[in-house]
Each structure stands twice: as structure tokens, then as C-alpha cells.
């Protein structure tokens, strides 16, 4: 199955950013908070309050007003909105101004559905336009009288044309969501979330003192459990009245660090029975805050026993003690993402943060051709979540559209450029009343590494949303983005940033193991899910966990081939250099051999002439000539871009390449390899023929790996065997004699000219001139091949 390269490639687009007034280079043109998106014009209608002045008709005085707003085929109403005690709603409705010519505002009596009055506004002449930072349009009272039914009411409202820059945009009820239940409209609104920063809590259980078992005739076998929130960790079992553990139990907590750690000592009476012999609780605020890489002091803590214990003949209070180190490790960065997709490396304490490096701005323009997981559903209620650092941004939900337009812009502070921005697009399942318990469905993700983004350029591209499954590579649509990174730091701070530590110093002074990092990352994800689920509107847990989902570690033949090709590409240049040098030695032609000897002779004996040539003006002229040739070549290669850069400072950057199908072995896909990659563990495949075929394929691959590992082990064992020969006295004596002879030769050849002659003679021998040439193996190589290895001992 071959993938279409053009279909899955990043395409360059040319939107009208900033309403055709945005500059491509922020240094040379006007910018605004929305210069990376296309301007969207809306008709805003703010319905604030109604007043009932009816005095003639008694039934009119108990009116329950409802406002209906109509533009073309779109209709919105306050019917399902909660009404205040003074008949106020204070709700903003937003319509696409191109959907009609006349805006109709109708006031009705809700219980009887009686029309009280109607107001019509012509869009072409009667509605003003507001562009921030202009002041808000003042609301007006409109008389809504009906002489036939004796309704005398007034409606306070305001109507204006605006864009997505307007302050009411995040709280507006859009016309495409008019069918959404009023209680669910909040789930369609855009929002920015700041996740609380995370910190490690280190509980080091050192030892116990004077521990007493419930059974006085038994030596206690105790382990310690510590619980913070929903996470419980325990130590190993240690026996004795003064057991020792010296074991770290590390938790993850979020600011403002108000939790409590509960510690229990469990005595293992036998394999089936356990009993608690002591408890202790400590608040996080009582622990030692470590803001530099260090260790907390070890202190003794009295344990609260389940039953009071008093030794015989002693009236003093008796208490077992536990020696511990309790600290909040604020000098670490808590990883919530995998290393490849990390977007933040800062420590918990703000004093350890590096200087601000730059600003990242993202314009989420829209999407095209979206496909949901449910093929029966023709439309999608989609929204985008962008995550960088602890700041999450969520666009509004565009209802019933496979090609939504958002045109929302967000920005982030960047402290490290070697990070990744993650954007996920989801199908909103929370906007219908009957889908209260349904989860939002992920459509796909796009990741943009910042180290591939050049500063001061605006990348406007359409990124494919790819989903890889057992059936192959599937395109779920395209996400249109405008990306810009601008440096804020200047001078030394900017150019020294690539050389500073990627992680806080504590990660290098007291590093955590990969096993610990994976376990703590799982804790961090759960805490983030819980924290963001408590916001309003909530960023749901399934969305947060999907955005923080790490790379799969399942076995994949496709990825194995990919990693081999990557490794081969890295060492290809080294292998090429080695092959060129080896070809000089192995060839029968004399020309390359004499060239090598000539170059060696010049560098060994004519160094004065080389020094004169380097310090002369001739070399400087040659370097300047090379620079001119390089610049002319670039100018002639793309004259239009050079002209734009020189006169307009406006160069369209090339599209960012985020996925290399050939490198990832996705240009030609083996469906069985994909089925094996996405198979569960243990395997859920029931077809024995398929399992046998996969097993035979793996055996063939591992056969080559086995032989390669065996050859490498054999050569290494022969090298070790050469050192074991030194244990023999005769060999040691010969080695000392050879060392003495070598030192004698070095001393005799210490003169510069003699040393150069010795080096030149060695080069002459190494290149194997015709009179030195010998196709038979060298004596040292013959000796090395005769050294023993453990391969002979294997059965």
C-alpha cells in the first residue's frame, strides 16, 4: 500500500492575514494581537434587559418575555437562557453578517407565544461598525408596544458590526450553535487555561527506631506506605525493632502545595495478615522546600500508635520514632510530556527560570476535509486545543462543519527553542443534551518543533492531520496555521541560549532514573487532568491525556527499519571517509598513492611555505572571491525572493516539513506489519497462519542480528584475551623490551627532521607502494585472529 506523497505533504497557503493589512515581517510593518489570522466580520446583538410598563391589561403585567433574533435562515432566542430577577439576560449573540440583509428582533410573551413587537434593522445602513480599541457601542432602549394586547414594554439592547478582536467574542452565542442547548453553550466557547505548575515531593524513609509489634513475642517485619492524594507508594520490608530502609518515595504535587502526606507503618505478621503499628501525617507546607540541588535534613518523627504503649514500671510517654527526610524538590522540572514532545523545561521555583528567549504566536485559521471516527456522521463539531508549557488554548467549537473557520490567535512565552508545540483537533460531544457522558473524540494532532522555525518569519501552511492505524495511513483532514517566532532576548542572552543547560541543574546533580521519570510522568498527567477538569468550561480529561500521550513503545518492524536507516545516515559520512582512505591503500593505481605521498611531504617538510601562503593576501583574495561566487549563485537561483528581501524585507518562507513519509517507512506500507504494530500484548490475533508468518519473519530478522552480535562479541573477547596474555611472565618480559626499544627510537628521533622522516617512511609503507605491496594478511592481524574467544566454548 503506497501513500500519496502530495496528499500527505505540507502545503503552503496564502491567506489575507490581518485583513490585508498585516506585514509579513513584524520589524517592518504594523502588527496587532490578531495579525496572524484572517479578519472575520460578525453582527453582534447584545440583549441586556426588558422592562414591563403594562398597566391596563393585568395579564400583561405577568409577562415572561422572550427575545428572538433572526438573520436570514438563522434564528437565536433567549427562551432557554436563565433570566434574572429584573428580566435581564445580558447575552451576546453573534451572526455571520453575510447570511442576510435585515436583522429582525422580536419580543414575545413566552407562555402564550404572543408577539409583542418587532424591530427590523437594515444591515447596510442602520448598524454601526466598531473596531477595538474603539469604545463599546452604548446600548439603547427600544419601545416594544402592542396596542392590541396592551403590552407596553421596553428592550435594552445594542447592535454593531465587529470582528473576532471584539471583547464579547469569547462569550458570544454564535448562530451556527443556535441548536445547542443553552446549558451546553458554555462548552463551545474559546478559553485559555493555565495549568498549575508541578513539583516533586520527596519522602525519604531512612530508618525506624523502637518499633513494637502487636505480637510482643515476634520481631516486627515492617514496611512503610506513604499516600498523597490518590497515589500510594511503599518501601521494601525490613525486620527488627530498628529497621533500616533508606528509600525514596517520590510524588507529584501541584501548586499551591496544600496537600498532606499520610504515612503508615505496616507490620507483616505472616503472608496473609498485616497490621498497622503506627501512623503519621505531614502537610506539604511543613516540609523543607529545596530550591537548589541539595538534600533535606534527616529528622526524627514520633509515630502515633493505634493503641497507647507503656513499658512496665515507667510512667513516661513512650513513642516509636521514624527517621525521615521530607522535602518538596522545587529545583526539578516535572515532566508531563515525553522527551521528544517536551514543551517546557523550567523548574518549579521561578528563581531558577532562564531568561525569556522569545515569543511564539500561532494563528489557528481553519481546517478542511475533516473526518470523524463515526463514518455515519456527516458533520463534525470541531475545536482545536493548543498546548505549550503550562498554557493551554482552546478555540470555539464550530458546529456542523467539516471545513470550520476559527481565525483565533494565541501567544506563548518561549524560554527554550528546542521544544515542541502540540495542537490537537477534537469532535465536541458535550453540546447535546443526550450525550452528557460521551467523551470528546480525537481527530488528530499536529506537532511543530520550534527549532525548525526561523525567527521573524510567518509560516502559513496547511498541515495534514494523519492517523496511523492497522488499516494504514489515513488523512483526517488539514489544519491551516500561521506560525511566527520572534526573539525578545538580544545580544549575549540570545546567542548563548543554545549552550546553556536544557534541564535545571538538579537533573544533573541528582538525576532520576528513566523508570522513575515514567512513573512520575503518569502521576503528572493524572494531576493535570484533574486540575483542568475543574475549570469552567472544563478541559476534559480525555483531551488532556490525549494531548500528553507519549510515543508508543510497542515493537514495530517499520520503526526498527526506520531507526536502522537513521543510524546508517549518521555514519554514512564516516564510512565514506574510511572507504576513501582504504581505497588509496588497496588500489593498484599509483596516481592516488603518489598524490597522498606528495600532500604528506608538503605538510611535513614545507610548513614554512604553507605558513607564508596562509598569511599572504592571496588567500584573503581567494576567500572573498568564494564568498562573492556563493552570493551570486544564491541570487541567480531565486532572483524574485532576493529582490523581495532587499527592497521589501518580505520573503515567503518554505513550508515546515513535519513528517517524512519515506523516512518513517510510510510511503510503502506493509499492512501486516502495521497490524502487528497495533496488535495488543499478548497478541489478540487468532489466525495461526498469520502468527506463524510473523514468527518466521521475526526469526529471519533476528538471525542477522544474532550473527552481528556474535561477531562483535568474538572480536571483543579476542581483544580482552590479548590483555590476559600479560599474565604470562615471558610475554610480559617481551612487552617491556619492546617498550624500551620504542622509547629508544623516540629519543633518537626526537630531532624534528628525524621525526618527520620516520613519519614519512611510515606513510610510504601504509599506502603500500608497488615495492611494498603485499596482498597477504599482516602478521599482527594473523596474531589477533588466533587469540581465543568464548565462541569455542558455546554448545
UniProtKB/Swiss-Prot annotation:
Residues passing through the membrane, by range: 590-610, 612-632, 730-750, 752-772
UniProt xrefs under SMART domains: C2
Membrane topology summary: Multi-pass membrane protein
Highest taxon of the lineage: Eukaryota
Pfam families linked: C2, PRT_C
Tissue-specific expression: Expressed in root vascular tissues and meristems. Observed in flowers.
UniProt GO MF annotations: metal ion binding
Binding site for Ca(2+) 1: 57, 109
Residues at which Ca(2+) 2 binds: 57, 109, 113
Necessary cofactors: Ca(2+)
Keyword NADP in annotation: no
One Gene Ontology cellular component annotation held by this UniProt entry: endoplasmic reticulum membrane
Subcellular location: Endoplasmic reticulum membrane
Residue span(s) of domain C2: 24-142, 180-298, 341-463
Function: May function as a signaling molecule by regulating the trafficking of other regulators.
Family of this protein: Belongs to the MCTP family.
Name assigned to this protein: Multiple C2 domain and transmembrane region protein 12
Amino acid at each position: 500500500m503506497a501513500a500519496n506523497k502530495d496528499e500527505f505533504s505540507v502545503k503552503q497557503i496564502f491567506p489575507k492575514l490581518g485583513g490585508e493589512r498585516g506585514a509579513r515581517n513584524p520589524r517592518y510593518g504594523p502588527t496587532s494581537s490578531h495579525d496572524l489570522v484572517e479578519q472575520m466580520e460578525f453582527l453582534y446583538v447584545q440583549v441586556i434587559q426588558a422592562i414591563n410598563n403594562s398597566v391596563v391589561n393585568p395579564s400583561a403585567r405577568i409577562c415572561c418575555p422572550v427575545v428572538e433574533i433572526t438573520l436570514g435562515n438563522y434564528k437565536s432566542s433567549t427562551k432557554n437562557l436563565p433570566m434574572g430577577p429584573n428580566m435581564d439576560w445580558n447575552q451576546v449573540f453573534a451572526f455571520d453578517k453575510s447570511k442576510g440583509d435585515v436583522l429582525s428582533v422580536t419580543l414575545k410573551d413566552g407562555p402564550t407565544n404572543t408577539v409583542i413587537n418587532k424591530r427590523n434593522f437594515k444591515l447596510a445602513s442602520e448598524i454601526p461598525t466598531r473596531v477595538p480599541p474603539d469604545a463599546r457601542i452604548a446600548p439603547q432602549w427600544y419601545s416594544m408596544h402592542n396596542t392590541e394586547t396592551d403590552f407596553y414594554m421596553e428592550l435594552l439592547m445594542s447592535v454593531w458590526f465587529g470582528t473576532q478582536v471584539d471583547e464579547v467574542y469569547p462569550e458570544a452565542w454564535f448562530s451556527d450553535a443556535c441548536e445547542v442547548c443553552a446549558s451546553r453553550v458554555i462548552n463551545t466557547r474559546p478559553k485559555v487555561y493555565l495549568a498549575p505548575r508541578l513539583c516533586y515531593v520527596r519522602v525519604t524513609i531512612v530508618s525506624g527506631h523502637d518499633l513494637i509489634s502487636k505480637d510482643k513475642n515476634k520481631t516486627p517485619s515492617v514496611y512503610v506506605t506513604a499516600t498523597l492524594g490518590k497515589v500510594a507508594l511503599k518501601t521494601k520490608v525490613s525486620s527488627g525493632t530498628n529497621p533500616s530502609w533508606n528509600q525514596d518515595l517520590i510524588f507529584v504535587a501541584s501548586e499551591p502545595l496544600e496537600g498532606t502526606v499520610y504515612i503508615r507503618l505496616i507490620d507483616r505478621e505472616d503472608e496473609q495478615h498485616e497490621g498497622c503499628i503506627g501512623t503519621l501525617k505531614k502537610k506539604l507546607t511543613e516540609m523543607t522546600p529545596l530550591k537548589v540541588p541539595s538534600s533535606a535534613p534527616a529528622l526524627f518523627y514520633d509515630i502515633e500508635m493505634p493503641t497507647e504503649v507503656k513499658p512496665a514500671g515507667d510512667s513516661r510517654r513512650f513513642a516509636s520514632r521514624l527517621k525521615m527526610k521530607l522535602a518538596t524538590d522545587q529545583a526539578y522540572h516535572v515532566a508531563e510530556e515525553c522527551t521528544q514532545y517536551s514543551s517546557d523545561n523550567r523548574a518549579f521555583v521561578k528563581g531558577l527560570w532562564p531568561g525569556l528567549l522569545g515569543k511564539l504566536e500561532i494563528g489557528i485559521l481553519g481546517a478542511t476535509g475533516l473526518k470523524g471516527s463515526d463514518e455515519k456522521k456527516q458533520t463534525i463539531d470541531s475545536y482545536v486545543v493548543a498546548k505549550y508549557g503550562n498554557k493551554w488554548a482552546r478555540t470555539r467549537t464550530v458546529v456542523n462543519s467539516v471545513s470550520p473557520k476559527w481565525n483565533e490567535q494565541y501567544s506563548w512565552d518561549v524560554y527554550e527553542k528546542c521544544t515542541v508545540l502540540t495542537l490537537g483537533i477534537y469532535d465536541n460531544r458535550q453540546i447535546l443534551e443526550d450525550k452528557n457522558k460521551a467523551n470528546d473524540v480525537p481527530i488528530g494532532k499536529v506537532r511543530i518543533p520550534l527549532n525548525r522555525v526561523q525567527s521573524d518569519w510567518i509560516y502559513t501552511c496547511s498541515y495534514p492531520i494523519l492517523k496511523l492505524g492497522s488499516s494504514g495511513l489515513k488523512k483526517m483532514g488539514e489544519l491551516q496555521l500561521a506560525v511566527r517566532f520572534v526573539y525578545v532576548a538580544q545580544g549575549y542572552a540570545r546567542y548563548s541560549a543554545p549552550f546553556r543547560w536544557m534541564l535545571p541543574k538538579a537533573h544533573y546533580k541528582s538525576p532520576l532514573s528513566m523508570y522513575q521519570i515514567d512513573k512520575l510522568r503518569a502521576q503528572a498527567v493524572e494531576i493535570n487532568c484533574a486540575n483542568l477538569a475543574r475549570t469552567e468550561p472544563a478541559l476534559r480529561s480525555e483531551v488532556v491525556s490525549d494531548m500528553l500521550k507519549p510515543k508508543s513503545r510497542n515493537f514495530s518492524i517499520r520503526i526498527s527499519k526506520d531507526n536502522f536507516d537513521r543510524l546508517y545516515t549518521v555514519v554514512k559520512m564516516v564510512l565514506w571517509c574510511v572507504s576513501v582512505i582504504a581505497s588509496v591503500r588497496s588500489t593498484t593505481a599509483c596516481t592516488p598513492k603518489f598524490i597522498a605521498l606528495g600532500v604528506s611531504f608538503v605538510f611535513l617538510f614545507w610548513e614554512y611555505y604553507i605558513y607564508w601562503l596562509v598569511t599572504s593576501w592571496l588567500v584573503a583574495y581567494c576567500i572573498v572571491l568564494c564568498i562573492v561566487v556563493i552570493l551570486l549563485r544564491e541570487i541567480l537561483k531565486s532572483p524574485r525572493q532576493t529582490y523581495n528581501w532587499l527592497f521589501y524585507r518580505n520573503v515567503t518562507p518554505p513550508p515546515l516539513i513535519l513528517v517524512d513519509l519515506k523516512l518513517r517507512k510510510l510511503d510503502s506500507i506493509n499492512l501486516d506489519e502495521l497490524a502487528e504494530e497495533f496488535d495488543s500484548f499478548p497478541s489478540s490475533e487468532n489466525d495461526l497462519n498469520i502468527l506463524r508468518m510473523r514468527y518466521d519473519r521475526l526469526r529471519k530478522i533476528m538471525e542477522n542480528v544474532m550473527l552481528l552480535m556474535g561477531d562483535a562479541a568474538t572480536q571483543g573477547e579476542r581483544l580482552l584475551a590479548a590483555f590476559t596474555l600479560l599474565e604470562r611472565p615471558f610475554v610480559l618480559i617481551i612487552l617491556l623490551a619492546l617498550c624500551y626499544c620504542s622509547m629508544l627510537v623516540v629519543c633518537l628521533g626526537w630531532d624534528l627532521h628525524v621525526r618527520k622522516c620516520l613519519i614519512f617512511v611510515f606513510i610510504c609503507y601504509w599506502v603500500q607502494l608497488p615495492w611494498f605491496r603485499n596482498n597477504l594478511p599482516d602478521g599482527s592481524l594473523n596474531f589477533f585472529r588466533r587469540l581465543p574467544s568464548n565462541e569455542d566454548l558455546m554448545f
